A protein has these predicted regions:
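C-terminal hydrophobic helical "lid"/dimerization subdomain
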Residues: 1-13, 252, 302-354
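Residue-level marker of beta-strand positions
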Residues: 47, 112-114, 123, 170, ...
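Glycine-rich cofactor phosphate-binding loops and adjacent beta1-alpha1 units
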Residues: 163-167, 205, 213-288
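C-terminal substrate-binding/catalytic core of Rossmann-like NAD(P)-dependent dehydrogenases/reductases
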Residues: 224-228, 232, 273-323, 334
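Short, well-ordered coil/turn residues at beta-beta hairpins
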Residues: 117, 239-241, 352
Length: 354
């Protein structure tokens, strides 16, 4: 993984930049932007958003992200017990939108609005052709752009792993966080009758506001409840978006015999509550990972973003208008801390004052 200095010299970070340090705390520091490479433009970030899943696994004194504890062998594509792949300080982020402030030697117009998946940093460099390809339409908000960069594609990719089996039928999404809420909307736009399950009433209220039927995971048997309503064969596909292995087990229980479960969440540590000798074994349930690092065979990054933009512009999917609590980039520590209160805060955004 690149060091902070390598990121700076490559033009990926500059100016006010958010870091997670060795104690697990968050700070905002500043770096002198590197000179622009030939053919690149400089973008000033207007807004970025913190991932309440992946980024939070690097945060805090008990950070659990596997890259902090094992080494990723790219050739073999497996983790090994060796010096970890990532070390603090970590400069992360992958949901951002901004404006071109220096076109360099290119023909890209100054002031062009751009979306992307760069880090929480004030300035970033981008090849001109990519900036033009990722221009943010004027009818979309900055927060829409932030979510077109990566959040929307995450969810479009996840729904693609349903392989169309959800169309015209009943599907379930576990987790009413940002990923779950957008996945549910994409699945509905793709023809599914979607039900959303979560343990937090405040998040289910957001799902209901988007028009979804919901079920509170209150410790009762949610799978049995829905199967009694829908029938044993009523639910073909479930998406697990919470990152809880207990929820993954319930997703396996809730689908029909030989049904499909798409695991979208980032599961940490050992899989507590996941009993593979139960319904997974006896019902022949198919379990597939729908994580964005592994694109569905029908998709490319370009098609994922194009579909996200289409859904956002025709208002089939609410992106930027989903609730988010905004902090100045200087108070990034407060933005991370707020995500430890999931009943009150769905997601947080950083404002760069541009």
């Amino acid at each position: 993984m690149p060091t902070v200095e390598e990121l700076r010299t490559q033009g990926e970070i500059g100016g006010r930049t958010v870091q997670i340090i060795a104690s697990g705390d968050v700070r905002c520091t500043s770096y002198e932007p590197a000179p622009l490479a030939e053919g690149s433009v400089r973008i000033a970030t207007v807004r970025s958003a913190i991932s309440p899943g992946t980024e939070m696994t690097f945060y805090g004194s008990n950070a659990s992200n596997v890259y902090l504890h094992k080494r990723w062998n790219e050739e073999l594509r497996l983790f090994e017990e060796a010096a970890p792949s990532m070390q603090y300080p970590i400069t992360f982020g992958y949901r951002a939108a901004g404006v071109v402030v220096d076109p360099g030697t290119t023909d890209v117009p100054t002031g062009l609005r751009v979306y992307g998946n760069w880090r929480h940093t004030e300035f970033t460099a981008m090849p001109a052709e990519r900036a033009l390809a990722q221009a943010l339409a004027e009818d979309l908000s900055w927060d829409d752009g932030v979510d077109i960069g990566q959040m929307g594609p995450i969810c479009v990719n996840a729904v693609a792993f349903g392989n169309g089996e959800h169309r015209g039928g009943i599907a379930v999404v576990f987790g009413a966080g940002p990923v779950g809420l957008v996945t549910a909307q994409v699945a509905r736009a793709d023809g599914a009758d979607v039900h959303v399950i979560d343990r937090i009433p405040e998040r289910l209220a957001i799902a209901e506001g988007l028009g979804f039927s919901t079920l509170l995971a209150d410790g009762s048997d949610t799978a049995a409840t829905l199967k009694r309503q829908m029938g044993a064969n009523g639910i073909s596909v479930a998406w697990e978006c919470s990152g809880s292995t207990f929820a993954l087990h319930e997703a396996i229980r809730i689908v029909r015999r030989q049904g499909l479960v798409v695991a979208v969440g980032f599961y940490q540590g050992e899989s507590r509550g996941l009993l593979l000798g139960d319904e997974f074994h006896h019902n022949g349930v198919r379990l597939v990972c729908g994580q964005i690092g592994n694109l569905h065979q029908s998709m490319t990054w370009e098609s994922l973003r194009a579909r996200t933009i289409e859904l956002a512009r025709n208002r089939s999917v609410v992106l930027g208008d989903l609730p988010r609590l905004t902090f100045s980039v200087e108070d990034a520590a407060g933005a991370f801390e707020a995500l430890s209160r999931p009943a009150a805060v769905l997601q947080t955004a950083l404002d760069f004052g541009k």
